[in-house]
A protein has these predicted regions:
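Charged, alpha-helix-forming regions
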Residues: 1-233
Length: 233
């Protein structure tokens, strides 16, 4: 199977946002991002046709590391149906408060049973986060995500990469911001976040050559923040 080598590029604000995507949906969005020219002008993507991306079952199969394209296409059709209703949330600090911006990922989707491919059309509102990028951006190869089994792991990689200096980095994040950024269930208590989100993700990352540790910080008796220290392979 041919290796994936296309790059996913997005502004840091998007990498650190709340995506509200399942793993199958994330694979489709990330694959579509590799087909966007991150250096192109926003005007180049004003036209709906330019924002419409085709993804075939072979591409999805490589990212998910599935055994066959039949399973890949099944997952793609199911995810495409859900994607039309998904929004990302970006928090931005103003002079007096913190505002939340909600943006739909896609405005339309199309697939034909048995065709082996789907089409998605990114919304115009999301394009400023995907193109005309000169600085403050997150970049990684799609092949780095091939076979990832948890959306938490994928989102942690994006978050840490957005704060990396070269291959290394250190960043402190509040428990609540970490919860929303990694799509962790609201019902999870702090102990659950550590045991069911962070530890499995670290295990998966270490198998991929990452060196990563985290420290817990308390406010009073409660763990309120986490500090991650990492080195990418």
């Amino acid at each position: 199977m041919k290796k994936l080598n296309n790059k996913v590029v997005m502004k840091n604000a998007l990498a650190r946002a709340q995506h509200e995507l399942k793993l199958t949906e994330k694979r489709i969005i990330a694959t579509a991002m590799t087909k966007i020219n991150s250096k192109a002008s926003k005007l180049d993507y004003k036209n709906e046709k330019a924002r419409t991306i085709k993804i075939n079952a072979n591409e999805y199969q490589k990212t998910a590391k599935l055994k066959n394209t039949k399973d890949a296409y099944r997952d793609m059709m199911s995810a495409a149906t859900e994607l039309i209703n998904k929004q990302l949330k970006i928090k931005r600090r103003t002079i007096t408060s913190i505002e939340t911006i909600k943006i739909n990922w896609i405005e339309s989707t199309r697939y034909e049973a048995g065709s082996g491919e789907i089409e998605i059309c990114f919304t115009q509102k999301i394009m400023p986060y995907l193109c005309a990028i000169k600085d403050r951006f997150t970049e990684y190869k799609l092949e780095e995500m091939a076979g990832i089994q948890s959306i938490h792991t994928w989102r942690i990689i994006e978050f840490l990469t957005s704060w990396s200096t070269g291959k290394e980095g250190q960043r402190t994040i509040s428990i609540e911001d970490f919860r929303t950024m990694t799509e962790t269930a609201k019902s999870y208590k702090t102990a659950d976040i550590l045991q069911k989100t962070i530890e499995p993700a670290i295990s998966e990352l270490e198998k991929r050559g990452w060196k990563i540790n985290y420290e817990k910080e308390k406010t009073g008796r409660k763990i309120s923040h986490l500090t991650f220290i990492w080195r990418k392979p």
